[in-house]
């Protein structure tokens, strides 16, 4: 099959798990003999065509009033204008139409669409492509993509959500199959009124299984945090946990965002070792317990699965798709249930049957079944 995958970012650009998941899927499809073109955006003003691991990649100019992932603070009016343009980005829609005419895909599979817009669905359907959409964030429901604001979850029934999502619901009628990366995110979109007459599935992200690593002595547990060092990810709670356990070593890998100056100071005051960016495999060798006090409704939780596959214990919160993961995988404990870090059990071995639904080949085959219809 000839497949176009669409995602806001693609290799080598990365801010979260979505980019990893889309890259794994793209390269797995190539290995199975399919033709794959990935369409994404970048911060430059010219289109760039390249190839990586057999995947053709097209980076389109961002085509808005500013680069949406810039760390520069913007005034409220600029933000509103950016999001209004992003409801239907005419420039990107035209570029995408040209790509469809050139590539002639059988399948258009969209993922994160912030900065690209849902206009691509309409263009794909115009040329009789089968359209699949996978939600990896909450962009369709609200432009902040997290459904988390001022320290609490946003209601999908709020006026703001209804207004921002209306045009996307209309464009969503061009989607043939809808996929959520957890039952939680799928059900949340259904609750918000999306994809009423569309086929719907849950397909968890593929996660490559790592070798189980030995732990250090039980009285010398090293606790780690990996991901974006932000409030919604619970990094402040990680720092406070460090303050309460000064005899333990606390290590954090990841980058701060533009609003995290106070968090960085909190980390330094809490004696948290900051590594900056660190590859997941390298980080897993430095720690014994992964602490992820996530506050927003994380749709999946790739780091949780990566940590479990690396033989770690995960301490986290009952949020979003992570609650589902705790019913599938062992070694996941909730912070509200833990009184003493030293009482946390050693990890138990993972059964192959528990890994299956995250297996790269298994996940790719699930998508291929959907592609074929």
From Swiss-Prot:
UniProt cross-references to InterPro entries, sorted A to Z: Glyco_trans_1, Glyco_trans_4-like_N, Glycosyltransferase_grp1
GO molecular function: glycosyltransferase activity
Domain of life (superkingdom): Bacteria
Pfam families assigned to the protein according to its UniProt record, in alphabetical order: Glyco_transf_4, Glycos_transf_1
Name assigned to this protein: Uncharacterized 42.6 kDa protein in cps region
């Amino acid at each position: 099959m000839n497949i176009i995958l669409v995602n806001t970012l693609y290799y080598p650009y990365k801010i979260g798990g979505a980019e990893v998941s889309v890259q794994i899927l793209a390269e797995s499809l190539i290995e199975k003999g399919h033709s794959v073109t990935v369409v994404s955006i970048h911060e430059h003003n010219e289109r760039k065509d390249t190839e990586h691991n057999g995947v053709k990649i097209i980076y389109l100019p961002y085509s808005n009033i500013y680069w949406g992932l810039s760390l520069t603070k913007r005034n409220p009016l600029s933000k509103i204008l950016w999001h209004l343009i992003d409801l239907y980005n005419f420039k990107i829609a035209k570029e995408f139409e040209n790509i469809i005419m050139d590539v002639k895909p059988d399948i258009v599979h969209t993922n994160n669409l912030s900065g690209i817009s849902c206009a691509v669905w309409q263009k794909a359907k115009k040329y009789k492509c089968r359209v699949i959409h996978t939600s990896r964030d909450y962009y369709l429901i609200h432009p902040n993509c997290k459904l988390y604001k001022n320290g609490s979850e946003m209601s999908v029934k709020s006026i703001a959500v209804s207004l921002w999502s209306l045009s996307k619901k209309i464009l969503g009628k061009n989607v043939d199959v809808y996929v959520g990366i957890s039952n939680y995110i799928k059900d949340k979109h259904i609750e918000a009124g999306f994809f009423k007459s569309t086929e719907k599935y849950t397909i968890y992200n593929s996660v490559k299984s790592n070798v189980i690593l030995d732990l250090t002595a039980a009285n010398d547990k090293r606790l780690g945090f990996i991901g974006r060092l932000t409030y919604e990810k619970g990094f402040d709670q990680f720092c406070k946990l460090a303050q309460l356990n000064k005899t333990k070593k606390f290590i954090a890998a990841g980058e701060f965002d533009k609003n995290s100056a106070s968090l960085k100071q909190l980390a330094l005051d809490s004696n948290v070792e900051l590594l900056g960016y660190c590859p997941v495999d390298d980080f897993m060798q430095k720690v014994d317990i992964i602490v992820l006090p996530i506050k927003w409704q994380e749709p999946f939780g790739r780091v949780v699965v990566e940590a479990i596959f690396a033989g770690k214990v995960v301490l986290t919160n009952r949020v979003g798709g992570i609650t589902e993961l705790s019913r599938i995988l062992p070694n996941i404990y909730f912070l509200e249930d833990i009184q003493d870090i030293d009482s946390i059990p050693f990890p138990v071995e993972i059964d192959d049957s528990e890994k299956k639904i995250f297996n790269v080949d298994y996940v790719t085959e699930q998508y291929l079944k959907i592609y074929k219809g």
